[in-house]
Every structure is written in C-alpha cells, then in structure tokens.
C-alpha cells in the first residue's frame, strides 16, 4: 500500500494519502495537535525544538557519495548505524496512523524530483503539503519516487546506542534515497532536508542550487535573487507588491534561468504587522501552519509581538496565498543579485556595490548574525560566516557552488549588491535595526537601476563602495560611521569585524585566487 511495504512499514492502523489541507486540519484537530487561530490558520507548538538542530544532522557515509561530500562541515554516520535506527523507526510506526504526501521539488520539469514524505503527525503533513510543489496526479505504483523522507517526532534515538548526539537525528542516506527525521516537531527540518538533498543532486546536472528568494518584474520579466541566511529578509523583501514572487527560499539556476524548488513559503512572523508586510500577514489563514506563536485563549488572535516561546515564530503557506506570485515557479536569467546580511556589530553600510571579485568573496564568506531562535540555543545575534549563505544545507565542497555562481555572474554580467538588514547606529543592544522601509527603498533603487550612475565613496576598512544617496532613504544613514555618536568606537568595532572577515577567509580559503582574496577587507592592527 503506497509503497510502504518496500520500506518495511507494515501493520499501520491507517495510511492517508495526499489528503487535502481541510482533511489534514480535521485530522490534526481530532488528534489534539494544535488549535485554529481567528483567521483559520492551524497553530502548533513544536515543543523543545523551536529551531533547527544542526548538531543532530548526519549524512550516511558510503563509497558512492564519500568523495562528493565536504566532511569538514558535515557529520558522517555509518551505514550500519543508519540501518539500525531505520529498523527501530519502522517498528515504531507499526500500529500507528500515518500520513503520506507525494509532491515535487523543482518547478522546472526538466530537473524536477519526486519526493514522498511520510509523517506521523497530520500537522507536519499539512506543512509539507503546502511547502512542496503539489501535483494533481493520483497514486500510481509505477511512478518512481526519487527520495523518501520519514518524519516521526515522537520516536527518540538513544545516543549511546545509535551513534548520534541526542534523541533527535536528521539523517540523509543518498545511497538508499531515504531521509529520516526523529524526535523534533520543528517542520523546518523537513523542508531543509529536501533542500540539502537538492543541493547534492543539482550540481551533478550543472544546476546551481541557491539559498535565496527570487522575484520578477511583471512587464519585463527581469528577475532578481536575494541570498541570505535565516532572518536576513529573503522572504520579506522578495514579497513586493510591484513584482511577481517566484519563491522565498530555495532556487536553482540553469542555462535558461532560475526555478523555485518549492511550492510554498516559510516566513518568520515575529513582530509581523499588516502595514509593513501585508502579503505575509494576509497569508496566515485557513491552510497555513503557524509554529510557536502565542494565541489569545479567548479571541484566538495571534500575538505576533510575543516571543515568550521563541523569537523564531514561523508560518508555512502555499505560494498561491501571495496575490502576485508567479505560479509557474520559473524566471529568466537574474539581472541583479543581492546578498543580505544582518550585521549585529552595526558597522556595515546599509548597501554597497560589489565587483565580480568582491561578489565571489562575499558569497563564499556568507557573513551574517545568526538571529535568535533560528537554531537551538541561539538567544541573541551571533556573528557567523556561513559559506554560500547556506552552509548547513550545502553538502558539497563550497568551491563547487562558488565556481558555478562565478561562471554565471561573469557570463551574464549580473550586477551584485550587499545589503545590510541588521543594525545601525551601534551594535545589537545599543543601535537599532535598520528600518524595513529604508531597506525596501534600497532594493527598489537597485531594481530600477538608480545605483548604476550614483556617486560612491570607498570604505577602506571593508573595501566596499558605498552609494551616497538613495531615493526614500535619509542620506545620513548611508555611511554607517555617521550613525554612531562616537566615531572612534565605530572605527574600533569596524576593524574588529573586518579582522573577523580576514581571519575567516585566511583559514577557510588559503588557496583562493589572489584577485578574490584582495576583494575583501584587509587586516587592521
């Protein structure tokens, strides 16, 4: 039944296949998995795990994949250990109700992959139903499934026996084309497992997988992509009422253009307001899954400003909940690439122009601050360097992805900008987060070509070119030193961050070509 016997899953009490969102909400309510908000969205608590658990993620080390995976950044697990855990997981699923969703990753039909996701929770099946690309196909046992993911939040590993680090484990086995997710209800683990799998598969077909959002001009069809780690603004900035949204997080870049890996969005909703983010706010309705928000027990209104459970409150919804979405999920060659960073030091400019060499430097550097709640244990912003703006999800050597991006930027003469959505006027705790209104104005100016002929000032500490004006943005915030009350303290903080850049690059990329190395900050005494 639904290929379960091939996996060794037998004697389930019920197997529900490709239920509709309404059916899944009914099941989840009946199973006490969550509640409905006043807008009809389904609200759940994910318990202990309110963010990803990167220390609990593993790849099965087999001869077939060993040479392709960068083991300096990814944890291996023995095939025998995986088999033992999988055997116990399969036994655990006996006499349980399970939910199955068949969908696709990759909107370009030439490169699409079929995924089967098996859940013990109806709410998690609702999430992945809304996040992957949905098909109208009925079940056909002859349809090949490219990868199967099994998520069982109530199944716990035993670290001492299973060779993992905690009761939770996210294990991807490329040889068997199976991934398992144990002991965590955080739905993002399913989504990011799909992404990690695609990030391994796609480069073998000369497709650059990217941790980015993308949108498109509805008239010219020119596309822009926004790279960035969690919380830097990918989803927010790509949801632009004047442009068509292609996708908010995961894309591939092939010879003909870009394509979304997904069929939905997964947005942060802490401090969400309709005035500043209307598209996301209005997407929180029936069929959406909301995680870890506080809900008024009487009115059932979501208290978006309340971070008492976690700052990493999230909502998953299908992309057609965004009114101006490009439902094909496909766009042309990007005209503009924007790197988003959330600088908690408060010293990077709000926007700077990058040469192709500087673009390569900042792509492999991937600087940002991990924002509170996005990973287990992160309570306040932590400066981090995440290769390709997505190191936790990139199984292969970073040079693979960097070279592919470099080739494409050069071939298409794509313009690249670095935008800081983090702090201004001081570091985290003293400065303020850059106003979203100003960041949107800068993005609009980039897309309109305003900065092509703007006046620039070179920043010697960070080796960046800073435009001196932008429509809709106060000129005094363009140069970060002007936003600090104490300029000497700014210089000390800026040099500290520049040295972090320098030391990170020197340690990670000693063999990088000199022209790329020289495009970054120099060491400051």
Swiss-Prot record:
Binding annotation for Mn(2+): 192, 211, 249
SUPFAM superfamilies the UniProt entry points to: PEP carboxykinase N-terminal domain (SSF68923), PEP carboxykinase-like (SSF53795)
Cofactors named for this entry: Mn(2+)
Signal peptide start and end residues: none
Gene Ontology biological process terms, A to Z: gluconeogenesis
Gene Ontology MF annotations: ATP binding; metal ion binding; phosphoenolpyruvate carboxykinase (ATP) activity
Record text on cofactor binding: Binds 1 Mn(2+) ion per subunit.
Binding site for ATP: 192, 211, 228-236, 277, 314, 433-434, 439
Record flagged with keyword Transcription regulation: no
HAMAP family linked to this entry: PEPCK_ATP
Family: Belongs to the phosphoenolpyruvate carboxykinase (ATP) family.
Stated name of the protein: Phosphoenolpyruvate carboxykinase (ATP)
Organism of provenance: Fusobacterium nucleatum subsp. nucleatum (strain ATCC 25586 / DSM 15643 / BCRC 10681 / CIP 101130 / JCM 8532 / KCTC 2640 / LMG 13131 / VPI 4355)
Lineage: Bacteria, Fusobacteriati, Fusobacteriota, Fusobacteriia, Fusobacteriales
């Amino acid at each position: 039944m639904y290929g379960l016997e091939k996996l060794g899953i037998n004697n389930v009490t019920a197997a529900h296949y490709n239920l509709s969102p309404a059916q899944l909400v009914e099941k989840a309510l009946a199973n006490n998995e969550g509640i409905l908000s006043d807008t009809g969205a389904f609200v759940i608590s994910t318990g202990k795990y309110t963010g990803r658990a990167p220390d609990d993620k593993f790849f099965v080390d087999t001869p077939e994949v060993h040479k392709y995976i960068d083991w300096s950044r990814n944890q291996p697990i023995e095939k025998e250990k995986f088999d033992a855990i999988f055997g116990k997981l399969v036994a655990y699923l006996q006499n349980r109700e399970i939910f199955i969703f068949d969908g696709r990753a990759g909107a370009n039909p030439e490169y699409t992959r079929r995924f089967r996701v098996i859940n013990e929770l109806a709410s998690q099946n609702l999430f992945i139903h809304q996040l992957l690309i949905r098909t109208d196909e009925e079940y056909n046992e002859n349809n090949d499934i490219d990868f199967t993911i099994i998520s069982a939040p109530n199944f716990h590993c035993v670290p001492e026996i299973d060779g993992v680090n905690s009761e939770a484990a996210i294990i991807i086995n490329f040889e068997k084309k199976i991934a398992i997710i144990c002991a965590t209800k955080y739905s993002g683990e399913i989504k990011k497992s799909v992404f990690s799998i695609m990030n391994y598969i796609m480069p073998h077909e000369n497709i650059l997988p990217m941790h980015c959002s993308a949108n498109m001009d509805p008239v010219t069809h020119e596309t822009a992509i926004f790279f960035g780690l969690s919380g830097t603004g990918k989803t927010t900035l790509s949801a632009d009422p004047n442009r068509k949204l292609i996708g908010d997080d995961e894309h591939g870049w092939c010879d003909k253009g870009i394509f979304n890996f997904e069929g939905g969005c997964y947005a942060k909703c802490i401090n969400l307001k309709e005035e500043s983010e209307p598209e996301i706010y209005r997407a929180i309705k029936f069929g959406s899954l909301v995680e870890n928000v506080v809900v008024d027990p009487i009115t059932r209104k979501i208290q978006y400003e309340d971070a008492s459970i976690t700052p990493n409150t999230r909502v998953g919804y299908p992309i057609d909940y965004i009114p101006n979405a490009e439902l094909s999920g496909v766009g042309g060659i990007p005209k503009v690439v924007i790197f988003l960073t959330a600088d908690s030091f408060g010293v990077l400019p709000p926007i700077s122009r990058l040469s192709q060499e500087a673009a390569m430097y900042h792509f492999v550097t991937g600087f940002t601050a991990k924002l509170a709640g996005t990973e287990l244990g992160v309570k306040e912003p932590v400066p981090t360097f995440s290769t390709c703006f997505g190191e936790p999800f990139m199984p292969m050597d970073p040079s693979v992805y960097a070279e592919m991006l470099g080739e494409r930027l050069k071939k298409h003469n794509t313009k690249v900008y670095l935008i800081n959505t983090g702090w201004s006027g001081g570091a985290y705790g003293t400065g303020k987060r850059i106003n979203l209104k100003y960041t949107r104005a800068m993005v609009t100016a980039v897309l309109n070509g305003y900065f092509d002929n703007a006046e620039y000032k070179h920043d010697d500490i960070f080796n960046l070119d800073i435009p001196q004006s932008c429509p809709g943005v106060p000129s005094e915030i363009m140069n970060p030193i002007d936003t600090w009350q104490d300029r000497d303290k700014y210089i000390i903080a800026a040099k500290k961050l520049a040295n972090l850049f320098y030391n990170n690059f020197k340690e990670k990329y000693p063999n990088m070509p000199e022209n790329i190395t020289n495009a970054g900050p120099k060491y400051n005494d």
